[in-house]
Amino acid sequence: MNLPPGFRFFPTDEELVVHFLHRKASLLPCHPDVIPDLDLYHYDPWDLPGKALGEGRQWYFYSRKTQERVTSNGYWGSMGMDEPIYTSSTHKKVGIKKYLTFYLGDSQTNWIMQEYSLPDSSSSSSRSSKRSSRASSSSHKPDYSKWVICRVYEQNCSEEEDDDGTELSCLDEVFLSLDDLDEVSLP
Protein backbone atom coordinates (compact mmCIF):
# COMPACT_ATOMS: atom_id res chain seq x y z
CA MET A 1 0.00 0.00 0.00
CA ASN A 2 1.44 3.35 -1.02
CA LEU A 3 0.65 5.96 1.59
CA PRO A 4 2.03 9.49 1.74
CA PRO A 5 5.06 10.22 3.92
CA GLY A 6 4.16 10.99 7.50
CA PHE A 7 0.89 9.06 7.36
CA ARG A 8 -0.16 7.89 10.83
CA PHE A 9 -3.16 5.68 11.47
CA PHE A 10 -4.31 6.47 14.98
CA PRO A 11 -8.14 6.58 14.87
CA THR A 12 -10.38 7.33 17.82
CA ASP A 13 -13.01 4.80 18.92
CA GLU A 14 -15.69 6.95 17.29
CA GLU A 15 -13.76 7.12 14.00
CA LEU A 16 -13.24 3.35 13.95
CA VAL A 17 -16.95 2.70 14.38
CA VAL A 18 -18.49 5.54 12.33
CA HIS A 19 -16.00 5.90 9.46
CA PHE A 20 -14.74 2.35 9.10
CA LEU A 21 -16.97 -0.32 10.68
CA HIS A 22 -20.30 1.20 9.69
CA ARG A 23 -19.11 1.58 6.09
CA LYS A 24 -17.86 -2.04 6.03
CA ALA A 25 -21.14 -3.37 7.44
CA SER A 26 -23.07 -1.28 4.89
CA LEU A 27 -20.89 -2.66 2.06
CA LEU A 28 -19.64 0.84 1.23
CA PRO A 29 -16.06 1.42 0.04
CA CYS A 30 -13.52 2.99 2.36
CA HIS A 31 -10.53 4.67 0.73
CA PRO A 32 -7.73 4.27 1.39
CA ASP A 33 -8.39 0.70 2.45
CA VAL A 34 -6.04 0.60 5.44
CA ILE A 35 -7.82 -2.07 7.51
CA PRO A 36 -7.56 -5.57 6.00
CA ASP A 37 -10.04 -8.45 6.36
CA LEU A 38 -8.62 -11.32 8.41
CA ASP A 39 -10.13 -14.32 10.16
CA LEU A 40 -8.30 -13.00 13.19
CA TYR A 41 -9.45 -15.51 15.77
CA HIS A 42 -7.45 -18.33 14.13
CA TYR A 43 -4.11 -16.52 14.55
CA ASP A 44 -1.91 -16.29 17.59
CA PRO A 45 -1.26 -12.59 18.30
CA TRP A 46 2.50 -12.79 17.68
CA ASP A 47 1.73 -13.96 14.11
CA LEU A 48 -0.18 -10.73 13.29
CA PRO A 49 2.68 -8.26 12.59
CA GLY A 50 3.03 -7.90 8.83
CA LYS A 51 -0.59 -8.84 8.14
CA ALA A 52 -1.82 -5.26 8.50
CA LEU A 53 -0.70 -1.67 8.58
CA GLY A 54 0.45 -1.07 12.14
CA GLU A 55 1.08 2.11 14.04
CA GLY A 56 3.76 1.31 16.57
CA ARG A 57 2.96 -2.10 18.01
CA GLN A 58 -0.79 -2.18 17.33
CA TRP A 59 -2.70 -3.62 14.40
CA TYR A 60 -6.25 -3.19 13.10
CA PHE A 61 -8.33 -5.84 11.30
CA TYR A 62 -11.86 -6.38 10.07
CA SER A 63 -13.06 -9.77 11.19
CA ARG A 64 -16.29 -11.72 11.30
CA LYS A 65 -17.91 -11.65 14.73
CA THR A 66 -17.75 -15.02 16.43
CA GLN A 67 -17.98 -16.58 19.86
CA GLU A 68 -15.23 -19.07 18.93
CA ARG A 69 -11.95 -17.31 19.71
CA VAL A 70 -9.57 -20.28 19.87
CA THR A 71 -6.18 -20.42 18.13
CA SER A 72 -3.72 -23.30 17.79
CA ASN A 73 -1.88 -22.24 20.97
CA GLY A 74 -4.47 -20.48 23.12
CA TYR A 75 -7.63 -18.43 23.17
CA TRP A 76 -8.96 -14.89 23.49
CA GLY A 77 -10.90 -14.49 26.74
CA SER A 78 -13.20 -11.62 27.63
CA MET A 79 -11.98 -9.27 30.33
CA GLY A 80 -15.60 -8.55 31.23
CA MET A 81 -15.41 -4.90 30.26
CA ASP A 82 -17.70 -3.60 27.53
CA GLU A 83 -17.73 0.14 26.90
CA PRO A 84 -20.36 2.00 24.90
CA ILE A 85 -18.99 4.35 22.23
CA TYR A 86 -20.80 7.66 21.75
CA THR A 87 -20.45 10.35 19.10
CA SER A 88 -18.71 13.46 20.34
CA SER A 89 -21.29 15.78 18.78
CA THR A 90 -24.69 14.20 19.54
CA HIS A 91 -23.71 11.70 22.26
CA LYS A 92 -25.60 9.01 20.35
CA LYS A 93 -24.47 5.43 21.02
CA VAL A 94 -22.78 4.22 17.84
CA GLY A 95 -20.79 1.19 18.99
CA ILE A 96 -19.47 -1.10 21.70
CA LYS A 97 -15.86 -1.82 22.66
CA LYS A 98 -15.15 -5.21 24.22
CA TYR A 99 -11.79 -6.02 25.82
CA LEU A 100 -10.19 -9.45 25.45
CA THR A 101 -6.85 -10.85 26.54
CA PHE A 102 -4.93 -13.77 25.06
CA TYR A 103 -4.32 -16.89 27.15
CA LEU A 104 -1.68 -19.55 26.53
CA GLY A 105 -3.34 -22.48 28.24
CA ASP A 106 -4.31 -21.10 31.64
CA SER A 107 -1.70 -18.33 31.60
CA GLN A 108 -2.77 -14.80 30.73
CA THR A 109 -0.42 -12.98 28.34
CA ASN A 110 0.16 -9.26 27.71
CA TRP A 111 -1.70 -9.41 24.37
CA ILE A 112 -4.87 -7.32 24.36
CA MET A 113 -7.65 -7.10 21.79
CA GLN A 114 -10.24 -4.36 21.61
CA GLU A 115 -13.20 -5.63 19.61
CA TYR A 116 -15.37 -2.83 18.16
CA SER A 117 -18.92 -3.71 17.13
CA LEU A 118 -22.01 -1.82 16.11
CA PRO A 119 -24.83 -1.64 18.67
CA ASP A 120 -27.32 -4.48 18.71
CA SER A 121 -30.47 -3.35 16.96
CA SER A 122 -32.55 -6.32 18.14
CA SER A 123 -35.14 -4.06 19.76
CA SER A 124 -35.97 -2.40 16.46
CA SER A 125 -35.38 -5.53 14.41
CA SER A 126 -38.28 -7.39 16.02
CA ARG A 127 -40.68 -4.69 14.83
CA SER A 128 -39.13 -4.49 11.41
CA SER A 129 -38.89 -8.26 10.94
CA LYS A 130 -42.64 -8.51 10.37
CA ARG A 131 -42.44 -5.75 7.79
CA SER A 132 -39.35 -7.19 6.14
CA SER A 133 -40.94 -10.61 5.76
CA ARG A 134 -43.61 -8.96 3.63
CA ALA A 135 -41.08 -6.87 1.72
CA SER A 136 -39.70 -8.06 -1.57
CA SER A 137 -36.74 -10.41 -1.42
CA SER A 138 -34.72 -8.03 -3.60
CA SER A 139 -34.34 -5.47 -0.81
CA HIS A 140 -31.35 -6.36 1.38
CA LYS A 141 -30.67 -4.63 4.65
CA PRO A 142 -27.04 -4.84 5.79
CA ASP A 143 -26.36 -7.29 8.60
CA TYR A 144 -24.38 -5.07 10.97
CA SER A 145 -23.81 -7.90 13.44
CA LYS A 146 -21.40 -9.83 11.18
CA TRP A 147 -18.41 -7.48 11.23
CA VAL A 148 -16.13 -6.17 13.96
CA ILE A 149 -12.92 -4.19 13.95
CA CYS A 150 -10.20 -5.61 16.16
CA ARG A 151 -7.30 -3.58 17.51
CA VAL A 152 -4.56 -5.89 18.79
CA TYR A 153 -1.49 -4.83 20.76
CA GLU A 154 0.95 -6.14 23.32
CA GLN A 155 0.79 -4.32 26.62
CA ASN A 156 4.34 -3.55 27.75
CA CYS A 157 4.02 -2.28 31.28
CA SER A 158 6.67 -3.16 33.80
CA GLU A 159 5.38 -4.59 37.02
CA GLU A 160 6.92 -1.99 39.29
CA GLU A 161 5.86 -1.87 42.89
CA ASP A 162 4.83 1.28 44.70
CA ASP A 163 6.53 2.21 47.98
CA ASP A 164 3.87 0.38 49.99
CA GLY A 165 4.35 -2.87 48.04
CA THR A 166 1.29 -2.58 45.78
CA GLU A 167 1.68 -2.96 42.04
CA LEU A 168 1.02 -0.03 39.73
CA SER A 169 -1.42 -0.48 36.89
CA CYS A 170 -0.46 0.61 33.38
CA LEU A 171 -2.75 3.62 33.67
CA ASP A 172 -1.09 4.60 36.96
CA GLU A 173 2.29 4.49 35.22
CA VAL A 174 0.99 6.64 32.36
CA PHE A 175 -0.42 9.26 34.72
CA LEU A 176 2.78 9.30 36.77
CA SER A 177 4.84 9.82 33.62
CA LEU A 178 2.55 12.71 32.62
CA ASP A 179 3.16 14.25 36.04
CA ASP A 180 6.90 13.98 35.37
CA LEU A 181 6.44 15.88 32.10
CA ASP A 182 4.80 18.74 33.99
CA GLU A 183 8.00 19.16 36.00
CA VAL A 184 10.19 19.54 32.90
CA SER A 185 10.82 23.13 31.86
CA LEU A 186 11.60 24.01 28.28
CA PRO A 187 14.51 26.38 27.47
Curated annotation (Swiss-Prot):
**GO (cellular component) term, any one:** nucleus
Known DNA-binding region: 94-161
UniProt keyword Acetylation present: no
Phenotype of the disruptant?
Answer: Reduced plant height and length of tracheary elements in the stem.
Q: Where in the body, by tissue, does this protein show up?
A: Expressed in root xylem vessels. Expressed in stems, vascular tissue of cauline leaves and tracheary elements of sepals.
- Purpose of the protein: Probable transcription factor that influences tracheary elements and xylem development by negatively regulating secondary cell wall fiber synthesis and programmed cell death.
Q: Write down what this protein is called.
A: NAC domain-containing protein 104
Organism in which the protein naturally occurs: Arabidopsis thaliana (Mouse-ear cress)
Lineage, highest ranks first = Eukaryota, Viridiplantae, Streptophyta, Embryophyta, Tracheophyta
